[in-house]
Amino acid sequence: MSAATRAVPFTLAMRSLQREIIRSDPAWKGGNYAANEAPYSGMALARKLGLVSYRAAEEWHQRFDRSRISKDRRTGAPFELEFEVESYLDYNANKFIHNFDANSYLYLSRAMDWFDVADHGGSVNSGLTKIHVKTALIIGVPPTFSSRQNNKEKLFVV
């Protein structure tokens, strides 16, 4: 997971949908599920939604275009995996669900929604000036479906 100085409305909406998907999985049971009976379907679908938002449309096109998976990997059912992009989402979602607890995800994502560094000084700049470190590492990625490129530039100003 990653976070910024504050969540923008699009990010709030995406995480809200992800939490709703997890909570609507019957296996969630209000958060009282056994470790081996976690809401895997909800977690996988929520992860797929997140994965789609982490890349810009052009990157999806360049990476996958309309490539199909090999015929020996297809089941023949009309709604099973057929495209490489579907296979990518499926693989990464299934990897995620066995390495992350659903309740932990729900609470961590909500905490990320609530956090706003401007709450600690009145503005992002004021909030960041309260952080006393010699060096800070800011890792940036190309703009995605859900990010705004100018957020990193704002951090460099402080």
Label for each model-derived stretch:
Residues Y91-N92, Y107-G127:
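Active-site nucleophile elbow and catalytic-triad environment of alpha/beta-hydrolase enzymes
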Residues S2-K95:
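Alpha/beta-hydrolase-fold enzymes
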Residues K95, M112-F115, V141-S146:
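Acidic catalytic loop of the alpha/beta-hydrolase fold
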